[in-house]
């Protein structure tokens, strides 16, 4: 298999969240940013506070940010509490959805737009790419783009997963 690429239709996605709800891609209103991660991944630990900033930057309802955990419910809950994550965390402990999307590593983000088309794939942690994702989401929701990671932020420009 190969990682789902830009321009391809996103595989179906239906996963239970830590909140007990089932999240289905085909029921989402607006674009979905799906971020695959593992709780043991140091790059994921670096990235998730910035994903939280992105989540807080734009009104909910016009878009969705879903973290897709490749770990157990208890480990995922501990990660959420440690990092102050408030966006939905979906559980893919059996890796069925991860295998369908086939990210090369974690974190990997898939921005899924209208018609379930993958419009952006961002592997690893990339400062510039997070700000570009922010601008794209702002366009979807009709808001001014928010800078998620300012130039003077001490995070490295890139960190592989």
What is each of the regions a protein language model found here?
Residues 38, 70, 114:
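Cofactor-binding loop segments of dinucleotide-utilizing enzymes, especially the Rossmann-like FAD-
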Residues 45-83:
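Structural microenvironment flanking redox-active thiols in thiol-disulfide oxidoreductases
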Residues 20, 110-119, 123:
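Short, glycine-anchored, charge-dense loop/turn motifs used at functional sites
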Residues 71, 92-93, 128:
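Short beta->alpha linker loops
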Residues 80-115:
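Short, internal strand/loop/helix patches
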Residues 1-32, 64, 81-82, 102-105, ...:
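Non-globular targeting/processing and membrane-anchoring segments
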Residues 24-45, 51:
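Short active-site neighborhood of thiol/selenol oxidoreductases, capturing the structured segment around
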């Amino acid at each position: 298999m190969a990682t789902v690429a830009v321009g391809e239709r996103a595989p179906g996605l239906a996963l239970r969240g830590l909140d007990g709800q089932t999240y289905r891609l085909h029921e989402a209103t607006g674009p979905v940013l799906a971020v695959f991660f593992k709780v043991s991944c140091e790059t994921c630990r670096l990235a998730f506070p910035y994903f939280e900033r992105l989540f807080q930057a734009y009104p909910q309802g016009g878009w969705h940010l879903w973290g897709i955990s490749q770990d157990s419910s208890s480990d995922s809950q501990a990660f959420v509490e440690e990092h102050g994550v408030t966006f939905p965390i979906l559980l893919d402990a059996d890796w069925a959805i991860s295998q369908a999307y086939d990210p090369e590593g974690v974190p990997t983000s898939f921005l899924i737009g209208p018609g379930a088309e993958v419009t952006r794939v961002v592997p690893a942690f990339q400062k510039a790419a997070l700000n570009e994702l922010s601008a794209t989401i702002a366009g979807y929701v009709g808001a001014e783009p928010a800078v998620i990671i300012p130039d003077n932020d001490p995070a490295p420009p890139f960190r592989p997963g």
